[in-house]
Amino acid sequence: MIPELPHAQLDWDDQGRPRSRVFDDVYFSSESGLDETRHVFIEQNRLGQRFAALADGERFVIGETGFGTGLNFLCAWQLFQQQAPTGARLHFVSVEKYPLSPADLQRALALWPELASFSAPLLEQYVAVHGGFQRIVLEGGRVILTLLIGDALEQLPQLDAQVDAWFLDGFAPAKNPDMWTAELFAELARLAAPGSTISTFTSTGWVRRLLNSAGFKMKRTPGIGHKWEVLRGEFLGWPEDAPAPARARPWFARPALGEKTALVIGGGLAGCASAASLAARGWQVQLLERHAELAREASGNPQGVLYLKLSAHGTALSQMILSGFGYTRRQLEHLQRGQDWDGCGVLQLAFNAKEAERQAQLAAAFPADLLHLLDQPQAQARAGIGLEHGGLFYPEGGWVHPPALCQWQASHPRIQVLAHREVLELRRVDEQWQAWDGDRMLASAAVVILAGAAEIKRFPASADLPLKRIRGQITRLPQTAQSQSLATVVCAEGYVAPARLGEHTLGASFDFKSQDLTPTSAEHAGNLEMLREISSDLLQRLGAEQLPLDSLQGRAAFRCTSPDYLPIVGPLADPLAFAETYAALGKDARQVPDLPCPWLDGLYINSGHGSRGLITAPLSGELLAAWLENEPLPLPRSVAEACHPNRFALRRLIRGKA
């Protein structure tokens, strides 16, 4: 999943231009890089005319092999801003095996000062770009860049999108033959929308023939600069003599899109993220929150930890966490550092032999700029407090004030926050969903998104989802002169964060039985014991043992989790009709019945984030919007399906328990 080299290895010529050491090739023409990009990719795909012809609310999807320095993307974005109507949107999806480091990207793009107004916002958001799918939102969501970091033949088969124009870039076929294969071109054809176009800088005969065989009609056209000819073409359709692509499974299909109005039930991280992603796409959103303010339950802690609990084996959950971490980390760039969040890093202590072994596996699987091992003296120096163990350090992690993130997300002008609205019943009337609290109708819209954690089980459509509540309590301790030295979040079984507004947060307990949210002295004592295991030195610096337990401040809330620890994100189906429609799967799970899924039209969910909501909820808002808008998914298809609500009904059918 992770490239052997985390970043491109570059040499720079005497004019400051980058050259790849791995492929021994240049990133762009030394004489006319911009002119060449515009001629080969912009003009051959007729992007000026096509952007100008877009309607308000319409989107255009460009796919690219080889992001490189981002020059093609920036030129496309510049033209889109010049030609497209204000309400149109651009999706740019690009695969890159060896992404440039932020410093190298900044150095390379400095060569093009005329693109500075586009490269500057890209560079601001070019943080935490690691393996897999990485979504970067620009211009308030009008332009979305999704980078697929890794080998093209591993990433593109996982892409779910319909591409209107392909930029076939990458290094020259002779230098990088893996990017110019029949297998890769078949993926481009699978992803091509009807009428899709394609262009590339090479005019090599065998490349043209392979693209023709994949379903594109290619022709040579005059080049520019030192390139005599280039190739352009159109997608004619899947070739008749080629094996058909695997049939789409209807239970993971996309429901039809209707009117762009939505009710979001629940004003925590999941609800605010869902509302923000839809509002950025032109939706009118009503965000219903039963409390007086947003983020009053599990999303209301003063500090949450931006911490990646990864697997070395590339599981669906690990891929979700890696993509979600990057997305949230980029969103935090919009907030006030020090008060709303701090990228102080996270240190996970190797507190026993099993944890030390797990950390060693992770350090071998992931690049050092994501995580790296520190021995005990290094860890102690990094943390600024006495520690008994070394551990794994995540330099881009840190702490977040979740209510600040929620409030920023909900501040979009197309979002109306309706406080003191507790939805007790949903009714479907004349293709609209109505939210009721008894005798009073609170609001109505074409789409409802259930984002109220486990409380959504009160609604019949989501009552069978296996969501469970786990009580957690945090403790707040006043900062002291001695505790100011804590320089990073430190975790073992629990966590402690550097102070925010004069208070440290530590926690959090796990109670699977209690349904009472009154903070208890017993759990404060448990949190202090977890702090002792992290650092007895910090416990002493805080004077925590001298504080009466009944004087400690804190709060309790319910986490909401699923049995497989993945969130539940996507459209909801009618449970009984689903079991009847796909009953045959109980006899043969391999078949794909050609029967449409019995969707509950306009009913969606974003829930089950457990203790990872800071990392998974914001990107799940994007995933939900992609399902609704028929856009490129922000996650690998297998991960999106692993998060789909229908996964539980499918498992019951296949096991014969429906």
From Swiss-Prot:
**One Gene Ontology cellular component:** cytoplasm
Q: Which domain of life is it from?
A: Bacteria
The molecular function GO annotations come to: flavin adenine dinucleotide binding; oxidoreductase activity, acting on the CH-NH group of donors; tRNA (5-methylaminomethyl-2-thiouridylate)(34)-methyltransferase activity
What keywords does the record list, in alphabetical order?
Answer: Cytoplasm, FAD, Flavoprotein, Methyltransferase, Multifunctional enzyme, Oxidoreductase, S-adenosyl-L-methionine, Transferase, tRNA processing
Segment FAD-dependent cmnm(5)s(2)U34 oxidoreductase: which positions? 265-658
Which compartment or compartments is the protein found in? Cytoplasm
Q: What is its main location?
A: cytoplasm
Cross-referenced SUPFAM superfamilies: FAD/NAD(P)-binding domain, S-adenosyl-L-methionine-dependent methyltransferases
Cofactors that this protein relies on: FAD
The EC number(s) given in the record are 2.1.1.61, 1.5.-.-
Task: Give the InterPro entries listed for this entry.
Answer: FAD-dep_OxRdtase (IPR006076), FAD/NAD-bd_sf (IPR036188), MnmC-like_methylTransf (IPR008471), SAM-dependent_MTases_sf (IPR029063), tRNA_MAMT_biosynth_bifunc_MnmC (IPR023032), tRNA_MNMC2 (IPR047785), tRNA_S-uridine_synth_MnmC_C (IPR017610)
Per the UniProt record, one Pfam family is DAO
Q: Where is this region: tRNA (mnm(5)s(2)U34)-methyltransferase?
A: 1-236
The record lists the catalysed reaction(s) as: 5-aminomethyl-2-thiouridine(34) in tRNA + S-adenosyl-L-methionine = 5-methylaminomethyl-2-thiouridine(34) in tRNA + S-adenosyl-L-homocysteine + H(+)
Q: Name one GO biological process term.
A: tRNA wobble uridine modification
- State the family named in the UniProt similarity comment for this chain: In the N-terminal section; belongs to the methyltransferase superfamily. tRNA (mnm(5)s(2)U34)-methyltransferase family.
PANTHER family noted in UniProt: SARCOSINE DEHYDROGENASE-RELATED, TRNA 5-METHYLAMINOMETHYL-2-THIOURIDINE BIOSYNTHESIS BIFUNCTIONAL PROTEIN MNMC
Q: What does this protein do?
A: Catalyzes the last two steps in the biosynthesis of 5-methylaminomethyl-2-thiouridine (mnm(5)s(2)U) at the wobble position (U34) in tRNA. Catalyzes the FAD-dependent demodification of cmnm(5)s(2)U34 to nm(5)s(2)U34, followed by the transfer of a methyl group from S-adenosyl-L-methionine to nm(5)s(2)U34, to form mnm(5)s(2)U34.
Q: What is this protein called?
A: tRNA 5-methylaminomethyl-2-thiouridine biosynthesis bifunctional protein MnmC
